């Protein structure tokens, strides 16, 4: 209530209205995801502002947020980042980096405090969408422009570079004391006329994506006079309604009237240069999150895994009472998912360690094997670069003696012997998977250390990952200095590390028994990534294996090989984000008439965003099944059927489309039958669709499959409806 009243009070002073202002309290009757679904469908709502303390269902929240953010911007402020704040709020809201990962993955924008919140609300209320990230700054003084530049630099923003034509026009139009550059300092004697000349020239150019105008109190150009002139110039310029504009009229009393004028004109205005940059970077971050949400992932190559063998190994270990597996035991598990580990042998004592070292060759590494000591370094339990039998024997005895002295209660299960990895020019990384109480498994990337503090040392992502999401995580880690972008000799192979992270993600998605995974160090050497030391914590898992994940993974169990009438086989499978190029090629082989039947309008071309929305789906709310055939060039899509359910998972709208040259092979029927089976198993009650009266093939197929067919000639449509509830359940 306190935050709500603060926002309302601020909005009243700003004369800003809300379509709805809803406080959920303890969410006993309605939850955040239901509210998001309602506001997404509401045409009066242009942007959504959320204040959150906790979540009751992370998966439903992420699902609803991803759906809503495709249509309108959503701002989130999350309290309870510190343990003390969580105690005050009586909430167990999970790790703060997990919230960042979920908010970014859903395409939302997080603000950190109420000051940023009000700034962002101002931005969303008035600012036009960004088309890029390059900022142009105009000011009547160097000092405020410098403050803006510093804040832009701190936030990794981009400054626009003016073209030579624009620079020359500015030289010709402005006094010699004004140096054409970015920022453009019009000097403290700048009149309203000088402002308008410069801004008109800039509006004529295409050199920037957003324009920030700073005005410091001046007797030469009073604030309200300059504001009126600017509003008029922007309104009259052909590009005025397309340019992203931010205004910063500094001061308080002398700028009140100017800020009121900007607000009435629908132009965002801020009190300080730093606040203006913060608002701009909010929109940049939001744009990046949305771009990430729609970017087509690269193919990840052959990432097949023998999950059956891995499940057997994990189950066997659990039945034997194991709760933690070390590098030697984890080796076949990671190997089944294509991850390379350093060959490891177990030695019972120093003599056996020497024997193994003689067999594999020097130098070797020797490591303690104990389930009771979480960090080997606590007892100096790792000895490297041992080059002789004497060194191995002495190191082994020293490790065991130290444990007996410092950890007398610890069990010693021998020693691990490894060939010494070639670390020359290599980079040491750390990949950790931990379970968050709210969002489930989290994948963390950093360089780590003995005291692992993921909030400070790592970037975090939610599984499942594809190549794009993994690449974004790595770039985020480099930019935030959690990892280095190169070793002493070579740059980090981002594509190779992305593939490794995707493999880790696949392992975690497949194996609910895994409670924690710690790969430290992961040695990055060129395009090779080798796990030197691994710890895997396991426990029995009972229940729905997918329910522990905040995002539903690819439903592999729906894949099915189907024989067509011509004897060829096609793979029926859920659509993937990587299918965008295949879907574009498929649509190019569908006639305009068939596309008109499907979309009820003439389709010239689908944009990238259109295709991204069709391929990057939320499997909890939507299902698209494609029929795929192997061809010389790889794969090709032969047909697709789709069902989009309502937020309550009661009804779903369906459609089906087959390549025009492949009709008569039974593809449409087989695809629709599979979709009916899926929606029924998914708990839906009814499947609905619309087609045209002259689409006789679809009408006939619907009748054969038991749909109720309602031909409405006056409306020019045919309504199709199928009950998915069995007669027994209805009775």
Show where each model-derived region lies:
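Long, contiguous binding/interaction regions
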Residues: 539-731
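Catalytic-core regions of core metabolic enzymes
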Residues: 1-533, 541-542
